[in-house]
Swiss-Prot record:
Catalytic residue list: 181, 188
EC number: 1.7.1.13
Chief localisation class: cytoplasm
GO cellular component: cytoplasm
Gene: queF
GO biological process: queuosine biosynthetic process; tRNA modification
Superkingdom of the organism of origin: Bacteria
Name used for this protein in its record: NADPH-dependent 7-cyano-7-deazaguanine reductase
Pathway stated in the Swiss-Prot or TrEMBL entry: tRNA modification; tRNA-queuosine biosynthesis
Sites where the protein binds substrate: 80-82, 220-221
Amino acid sequence: MTPEQSPLGKPSAYTEQYDASLLFPIARKNAREAIGIGAQLPFFGTDIWNAYELSWLNARGKPQIAVATFFVPADSPNIVESKSFKLYLGSFAQTAFESMETVRDTIKRDVSASCGATVSVHLTAPYEFGKLQMEEFEGLSLDRLDLDTDVYHPDASLLTAALDEAPVEETLVSNLLKSNCPVTGQPDWGSVQIHYVGPQIDHAGLLRYIISYRNHTGFHEQCVEKIFLDVLKACKPVKLAVYARYTRRGGLDINPFRTNYNLPMPDNMRLARQ
């Protein structure tokens, strides 16, 4: 299925009775082929989704709530289109379930089937909400740089590195990532953390490159994979990890992580803008 066939950007009838058919899968393949990624992926990782508007009824009709977190493996053949995900989660609102575990297992089954891979699901109950603390990305802020730029479409030629010098290890951070939904044109605001080992990347060029996504249209996952691939090709790091966290829309935030070396999956930290 293509994004144009999805419910995104179209009037939708909201249902409050559970309906797994609302989930709309989109194949990762086409977007990856467009940037030169074939069947052999140059990375592994996960997409972390957080859903803040999940509610259902218990067996006695009393509303229940939870914050849901989903871990979608980067090698899954599909992603779930975000509006369909919102509609699907909304369909739980007037449906009775025996327990929170039943809700979790139902969501895990449905979303895994839609993505074509096993998706991990965690539900945070209200008594645990106090543990959901805000954090910020660790690393050197690129946003401190005072620079000029007029490039607002992705341009990998902005990326340079000291290829003839000794390798370094750095973690660089920017809150200036912005792209746009390819279906609705709505802005997607994000923060990005880039950790690498290799030739030192020119900081000003990297910041200009991140800013160059400002008028780009692409889903969150696609943007992060393009950033990963462009940095890998232009700057030739031995190790590279890219983690972006986007602000929520429709009660959902999406946070893709890609790496080419063994790392634990990143913390599902909530940034201030999320």
